[in-house]
Design a protein with these regions (language model features):
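A flexible loop/linker signature enriched in serine peptidases of the S9 family
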Residues: 1-15, 24-35, 44-67, 74-86, ...
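Acidic, glycine-enriched loop/beta-strand segments at the rims
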Residues: 537-539, 555-568, 581-583, 859, ...
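Histidine-rich, glycine-flanked metal-binding segment
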Residues: 561-602
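Metal-associated gating/positioning segment near the N- to mid-region
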Residues: 599-658, 676-682, 735-745
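Active-site neighborhoods of metal-dependent hydrolases
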Residues: 674, 686-706, 750-871, 876, ...
Length: 967
């Protein structure tokens, strides 16, 4: 049957199938389930596993009498609350005489007699094994103290109709440049979000949307010239998205109430209140076309009578301006990615449109953990629907984006039946198709001539000339034919020779082939390549200027086991310059001195599995998730699956000081079922080039990409491109071990079985694979977060209320039922058992990480840290896992993770000593991130630039009691 997280028992029962009558009868009814049935050779005995309280045992049934008794208890923990890919229990078997059962538990093999009162006999065994493992994959990524930084991403880049200019956004500000050799220039001096530019048909104007936390959004028009003239088109602030300018001079866009976006706590908001509207660019009244109804990618052709849109199943549709006469022109699909979780009959690939933008219709959980009721060990059967199908202005072909690649397809004439085109193999598509991208692409767009195509990736931008590509291919075919003709002539000449002459020619050819060292390799066939330009926009990095002395505090440096009971830490600008005993440092005049008497100093915490998903497509200027994590002492984060590339811009905004938050690192979208079914090493190299060259993520998430060969391609390509890959646990112990053997340096989520013995933990430790167990979403039992929700007064936490929007906090902490889980007796929780394995790993010199999984932003990190510590490791070990281990896991241990001279100034000042009680990690008085000193409660900056935190983006007042009604 299906499995699920936070499961109720029973999960399994045993059935008996009558092969003559074809009937199935359930023969067990145990609360703790019944599983792994094992029959004796003589048919007299049945042994099966079951759970009693929180432990698993073996039950012996006499099949003649029906009587049962416990044969062995406790034994190996069962895997009934997981996918159990190796079986719910290890296999067992009766001896040929049916008198003994051979089973394994407790790390040993046992011989169990069916006679009651007989003690189990250990069967001694020893295995001497030399285990071949891939070399350790580790890179160090320096953080440069430069004054400026190159923007990582350009977004929504669109060419002018004639292709001579390019409009795009960087850090949510609108730029225009002459294409391809111009210098990017700001269009306005606005200090709010500018997004989604669209050109007028004559190329002289640009329309774009805005967002401001106080004012809301509007639509603007910029007339480009010597001095750009900018005017606001809309008269009512609202939530606007995805404008498009038609050839009959109408600006069409999506509109929703301002509240819809202002109140959104995550990327997922309802499309129910959004409309498709149009306005005259000269002003006037907004005209309603239709409700959005899960449609998007608004665009136009030269046929001004119709509006073109997409639906989530990959269809290109059109309708008239009054929303009548809707037609479907084509339905497009791509490859079948490995391990997709689409359900039977579901054709949208878990995508939907919100305010005209294609969005993943899922939560962070579903895109980082194996979804309940699914098994991703086999490829799915449904191809990916196109995310965008954009009709060319000429109306005879379309630009397609599917699984992060871009194609051009021919649109067949309408004959009544909707044509379905697969671009999985363009050479065999039902209508002419062409793949344009080699390494992926985003934001596809046409030029007016319907011949040139544009797309972006990171800060790279490409143009592809379809006619030039066809001409290039035609020239290759002509050259091939000429070569074949020459070969044919040579063969005819050879046939005319006598036997001796042919033998001489053959001998010469063999000698030449032997001496030609290049004969063993087949040169790649030349092909047309898109033209690439790196769009360079530099922004000033946020870097403080000042000196801070943290004096007379307990300093837990994480430099080995060093603890300075009364120590000082000196910070100049954004670096620690000295750490020592009280009064031993040379302090510059004018330093800001913070008396830390009675307090404890630790490095800023590193969250190695932090899902912080802000708003996609349109970006806010302050992000509550970022503020919450920083206020709770998390100064560095790594999101190991972001689903989209929006994080690249958000990370730049933090680096620029536009958003207050921790350091934002990520793997970008996971490499795996997100988009791929890898064919070979070369394709894998191309896929990873997105991350190494264009996203600059430094780490990647190898997310169940497929079989072991495919996984080995990923780690080989990652090593070549200096990327550190982490892996998805997937509730599959065998998978986890092969990933370890292949040299992967990271593992996300707990290993699904426990206890773990030293053969496993020592191997992981020696391989230096960092295990981030994410115990708040434990495998194999109730999630640890449910322990805290039932033992803590979460909703009443004032600090949490300050940083968490009401809807988010109330939904998580007032009631917990269904998939969130509920109440579980303490003994049934498994997080401490998993934590024992982490302790064994750390005791043997291994690496672990603290990953909050985005379950409860801010405080959730401490819950995870306390859970990791619950397996018996010392408090100092737990703090090391939270700091220097985490920094090592993401290649930043030379810059972060300890309090040492030369490292970046990420420091927490705690009111209480976490060495005495690990829960004192949540006694934060001050947070210092990159040399800036913040109040640990309000996150107001104290030094060097005193200023209050802007909370307009998420703080709102509740209702005022004004009725006099008493309950």
């Amino acid at each position: 049957g299906a499995w699920n997280y936070n499961a109720l028992l029973p999960q399994y029962q045993i059935g008996s199938f009558d092969r003559e009558k074809g009937k199935l009868t359930t023969i067990t009814t145990r609360y703790g389930s019944a599983f792994t049935p094992t029959l004796s050779k003589d048919g007299q005995w049945l042994v099966y596993g079951s759970r009693h309280e929180d432990k698993t045992g073996l039950i012996l049934r006499n099949l003649s009498s029906g009587e049962e008794r416990w044969l062995a208890y406790p034994v190996q923990r069962d895997e009934q609350e997981s996918i159990a890919p190796l079986g719910v229990l290890p296999g067992m078997s009766f001896t040929p005489d049916s008198k003994f059962l051979i089973a394994s538990y407790g790390g040993k093999i046992w011989k169990l007699s069916v006679q009651e009162g007989t003690a189990p006999q250990e069967i001694p065994f020893r295995v001497n094994l030399e285990l071949e493992m891939g070399p350790r994959l580790y890179f160090n990524y320096p953080i440069q103290d430069t004054s400026h930084q190159l923007a990582t991403q350009i977004r929504d880049a669109v060419p002018s109709p004639d292709g001579k200019k390019l409009a795009f956004t960087v850090l949510n500000r609108l730029y225009v440049m002459d294409w391809p050799n111009g210098t990017p220039q700001r269009v306005s001096q606005h200090n709010f979000t500018e997004a989604m530019p669209a050109w007028s048909p004559d190329g002289n104007q640009i329309t774009f949307i805005s967002w401001d936390e106080k004012e809301g959004g509007n639509l603007y028009i910029a007339a480009l010239g010597g001095k750009n003239e900018i005017r606001q088109l809309t008269t009512e602030s609202a939530f606007y998205m995805s404008p498009a300018w038609s050839f009959n001079n109408r600006i069409t866009f999506f509109r929703g109430p301002k509240r819809l976006f202002k109140d959104a706590e995550s990327p997922f908001y309802s499309d129910a209140e959004s409309d498709i509207v149009w306005m005259d660019p000269r002003g006037g009244k907004m005209q309603l076309i239709d409700k959005a109804r899960n449609r998007g990618n608004l665009h136009f052709t030269r046929d001004t009578s119709r509006i073109f849109l997409n639906t989530p199943d990959g269809s290109l549709i059109s309708m008239r301006w009054d929303a009548t006469d809707e037609k479907t022109h084509v339905k497009v699909s791509g490859i079948t990615p490995y391990g997709s979780v689409s359900e039977a009959g579901e054709e949208t690939g878990h995508r939907r449109f919100s305010m005209g933008r294609s969005m993943l219709d899922a939560s962070p959980l579903n895109h980082c953990m194996l979804p309940a009721n699914t098994d991703m060990r086999e490829p799915q059967s449904m191809p990916s629907p196109a995310e965008a199908v954009l009709m060319a202005p000429s109306g005879n072909k379309a630009l397609v984006k599917v699984t992060n690649n871009i194609y051009v397809i021919t649109i067949p004439p309408q004959t009544g039946k909707v044509p379905a085109i697969s671009v999985a193999d363009p050479a065999s598509s039902s209508f002419p198709s062409r793949q344009l991208t080699e390494i992926g692409g985003e934001f596809p767009a046409w030029e007016l001539n319907s011949n040139k195509v544009h797309w972006s990736l990171g800060n790279g931008h490409w143009t592809y000339d379809v006619d030039a590509a066809e001409a290039f291919e035609d020239s290759l075919q002509t050259a091939k034919k000429a070569t074949e003709l020459r070969k044919a002539d040579s063969l005819r000449t050879l046939d005319a020779m006598d036997k001796a002459a042919r033998a001489a020619v053959d001998s010469i050819a063999k000698v030449k082939a032997k001496s030609d060292t290049t004969a063993k390799t087949t040169p790649k066939e030349p092909k047309y390549e898109a033209k690439e330009i790196q769009v360079k926009v530099f922004f000033p990095k946020d870097k403080p200027n000042g000196v801070v002395l943290l004096k007379n505090g307990r300093v837990i440096t994480m430099k080995g086991n060093e603890v300075i009971e009364r120590g000082d830490v000196l910070i100049v600008n954004n670096r620690i310059v000295a750490v020592g005993k009280r009064g031993s440092l040379k302090v510059p005049a004018g330093a800001k001195e913070i008396d830390c008497s009675g307090k404890t100093l630790v490095p800023g915490f590193v969250d190695t599995h932090a899902h912080m998903w802000p708003f996609w497509g349109l970006h806010k200027n302050q992000v509550w998730i970022y503020a919450a994590n920083l206020a709770y002492g998390v100064t560095t984060t790594r999101d190991p699956q972001t689903a989209t590339t929006d994080v690249l811009t958000y990370g730049d905004m933090v680096d620029a000081g536009q958003i207050v938050g921790p350091r934002i690192y990520s793997t970008g979208p996971g490499v795996g079922y997100w988009a791929y079914n890898l064919k070979d090493l070369d394709q894998t190299r191309s896929v990873l080039k997105q991350y190494s060259k264009y996203y600059n993520t430094k780490t990647i998430k190898m997310y169940l990409v497929g079989n072991r060969q495919q996984r080995q391609w990923v780690i080989e390509a990652a090593k070549e491109q200096k990327l550190m890959p982490t892996t998805e646990g997937g509730l599959d112990f065998k998978l986890n071990m092969t990933q370890l053997f292949d040299g992967y340096p990271g593992h996300e989520h707990a290993l699904p079985i426990f206890p773990l013995y030293k053969d496993v933990t020592k191997s992981i430790a020696e391989a230096k694979m960092t295990v981030t167990p994410t115990l708040l979403v434990s495998y194999g039992g109730p999630w640890a977060e449910n322990y805290y929700y039932t033992t803590e007064d979460v909703y009443a936490d004032k600090k949490l209320q300050f940083y968490t929007p009401y809807e988010e906090l109330a939904a998580k902490s007032r009631r917990r039922v269904g998939s969130l889980g509920g109440w579980f007796i303490k003994d049934d929780h498994v997080f401490s058992k998993h934590a024992q394995g982490i302790k064994s790993l750390v005791d043997q010199g291994g690496l672990a990480g603290v990953g909050s999984h985005g379950q409860l932003q801010g405080l959730g990190y401490h819950w995870e840290l306390w859970s990791v510590a619950s397996g018996g490791m010392s408090n100092l070990q737990a703090l090391q896992v939270a700091t220097i281990h985490g920094a090592t896991a993401i290649g930043l241990d030379k810059e972060l993770g300890s309090l040492e001279a030369g490292k970046l100034a990420d420091v927490l000042v705690l009111d209480a000593n976490p060495l005495e009680n690990i829960r004192h990690t949540n006694s934060i008085r001050y947070v210092i991130k990159d040399g800036r000193l913040y109040d640990g409660n309000s996150l107001d900056e104290i030094y060097p630039t005193p200023r209050k935190l802007n909370t307009d983006a998420w703080r709102k007042d509740g209702p005022v009691v004004n009725t006099g009604v008493k309950e």
